[in-house]
């Protein structure tokens, strides 16, 4: 099978002709452009929803700016917070916060909060759990 793929690669340098034809038609008919416009509106709404929820639940604890692009918000904590502890507390409520989105040193405590794959209900649940974890840690 591996040898056949190698031979096919040598013979057919052009790729998948049917796929190329289909994509060409989609571009010519404006399908890609319509999908892009629709996607941008969805992600802008998710960004706005996330920013509003962060302000509502964590407004006094974090600073952030709505990004003009991308699928995440960089949130800096106003006061130092032990992000490892926050992550552990959130895990008790089934909210997994990977260490790769946490940033902490002597001068800054921040998180990269992604919103691209969450709907408003999921966002609100996650941010509420995060806010409760911060509140519990402050006690």
Language model feature labels by segment:
Residues 1-139:
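PLP-dependent class I/II
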